[in-house]
């Protein structure tokens, strides 16, 4: 049944995550969880939602017309969400608020993409030079 398959899928996913975390820790690698929500649906270039290729589901088309691998775009977005969090975490509240005002999308991490990280990085550097 569908419910059993879903439970099995979640169990396998958790098992794989746990195995990867254990091996990473054993090798001295730091592990951090990031929300993967919408990472495949949103284009890493910031152009919005992607359209999946009906013949090859691993390919998608951005609004700009560029064709890209969905998993690669999602990987960029997942990495961006991690680095956005790490860039903002050590900052005092006033600086963080200032950056969030300049790049408002970083407030809501589930919609952050690689292009937002690039904008945030520019603004962080502008703050440092000011």
Predicted stretch roles:
Residues 1-130:
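Positively charged, helix-rich recognition surfaces that bind polyanionic ligands
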């Amino acid at each position: 049944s569908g419910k059993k398959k879903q439970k099995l899928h979640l169990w396998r996913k958790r098992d794989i995550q746990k195995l990867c975390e254990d091996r990473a820790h054993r090798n001295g690698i730091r592990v951090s969880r990031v929300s993967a929500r919408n990472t495949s649906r949103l284009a890493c270039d910031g152009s919005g939602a992607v359209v999946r290729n009906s013949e090859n589901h691993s390919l998608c088309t951005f609004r700009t017309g560029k064709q890209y691998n969905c998993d690669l775009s999602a990987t960029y977005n997942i990495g961006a969400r991690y680095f956005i969090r790490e860039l903002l975490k050590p900052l005092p509240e006033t600086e963080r608020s200032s950056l969030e005002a300049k790049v408002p999308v970083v407030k809501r991490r589930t919609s952050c993409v690689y292009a937002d990280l690039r904008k945030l990085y520019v603004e962080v550097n502008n703050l440092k030079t000011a």
